[in-house]
Amino acid sequence: MGGLASELMDYGCEKVYIAEDPQLSLYQGDFYTDLLSKLIDENKPETILWGATIIGTEFSARVAAKLKTGLTAHCIDLYIADIKGKPRLAQVVPGWGGNIALIIICNANPQMATVKPGLMAKPPQRKVEGEIIPIAAEVIKNIIVGETKQSRAETIEIVEEEPEEMPLEEAEIVVAGGWGLNSLGG
């Protein structure tokens, strides 16, 4: 975990919270949601950005629901807008089948948005001397052994498969054709 925390600081993160417990080694939505929601309640961040991955999409929706805040999914652009003299995260999403772009502003905090991995360029590194904050073992245990006593989901087996082809989102060049192409020759 320390390597990831260091990499986050290479990109400007000033505080990195680390929760380590054997029961957190695999994603378990209920434990992760309770733990992150507690951290958000205590630290009051203005904005939370998520990767629009399989886990990120599900995890972000759980946290947004628990915190009773908005979540804008699959943003194609983000920027800070001045709304009534207050900086807010402008979240741009495709609408109407991709023919228009909609700008969404969430008035509640935390503002939350998901972005597809690789959609935006990595920012230049700006290494900071950040702080790694371990989450106390008793805090983790209280969440894991709270009301439910166990996760409602259980991992039975992990099967890792090598992809046969490169995932589309990782390709540098994508060529696509519509119904107008009758053959390879056009």
Where does each model-flagged region fall?
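N-terminal glycine-rich FAD/FM-binding segment characteristic of electron-transfer flavoproteins
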Residues: 1-186
